[in-house]
Amino acid sequence: MNDSPRIPFDCGVTIEDQLYLAYEKKIDALFITNHNTLNGYKQMIEYRDNHEKLRRIKIYPAEEITINTKGHILAYGIYETIKPGMDIDETLDAIKKQNAVSCAAHPFAVSNGIREKAIKCDMIETFNSNNIDHYSNLVAEKFSSDNHMISIAGSDSHVLTTFGRCINSIESENKLDSILQEMLKRKSKILKAELALKEELFEHAYYMLSASKDHLLNYILVHHPSKFSLVKWTLDSFLSKPNSKLWKILGSLGLYLSKRVSKKVNMKGHNPYVFQDRSWKTLISMSLYP
C-alpha cells in the first residue's frame, strides 16, 4: 500500500445514516456510485432489506470509474464492477456490454474531468455540488446545451449534510430498466441543484486526512524520507486543531487559488491537464499570477 500517494479513504458517512436521511427527505430511489467498486451498493441493499421501514427506497447499482487519464465516468445500472485504469473507449464499451448508461462526471473539473470527451457519454453531469469554483459547472452546462446532451445534477456527497443536495426527477416506473430507458429518452429533469458549503468541503478534507494518515505517512517514509518529519508535523497540527484560525485561512486560500486555476483553464484556455501532469510549479504559477 506504499506505492501510491492517493488517499484511500474518501467518505465516512455510514450506510445507516444515508438510508435514514433518504427516508426523511422522501427520496424514492438512489444510485450508489462508489469509486471503482459495487461494494457500497451491495452493503446498502443488505441493510435496507433488514429494516422494514426503509424497504420503500429503491437502491440501484452504479459505479464512478476512474479512467487512465484520472477522469471519472459514472456507470448507471451495472451489476459487475468495471475495472479502473482503462481508456475512455474501453470503459464505455464495458458499460455498454452491461446495457448500462454512461455519464461524464464533473467533466470540466480541473483535476478529474474528461472535458470535451464527455460527448462520447450518454449523459453529462452539468451541475456538481462540489464544483464551488462555479466555472466548471457553467462550462459543462454550455457544453451540454451546444451538443444537445442529456443533463443531470450530482450531489457527489462525501459528508452527511450534502446528501440529497442535488435531486433529479425521472418520469418512469421505479424500476431500473424503466429509469434507464426514460433517462435516455430525456424524461428526466434537475429538480434540485445546490452547491456544497465551504465548511462541508473542509469537513470532507478532515475526514480524508484523518482516515488516511497512516497510509500517507507510510508513503512519505518510503518515497520521500527527508520530508517525513515535516509532513507528520503538518498532519498532526491540522488534525489536532482543524478549526483553528490558521487552518481556516489556509483552507480558504486554497479554495481561492483553485478557483483561479479553474477560471484560467475553463474560461481563458490554459492547459486543462495541469493536474494530470502533476506540475506543482505550473499550478502555483497559474494560481498566483494574472
Describe these PLM feature segments.
Residues 27, 53, 100, 148, ...:
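Residue-level recognition of short, well-ordered coil/turn positions
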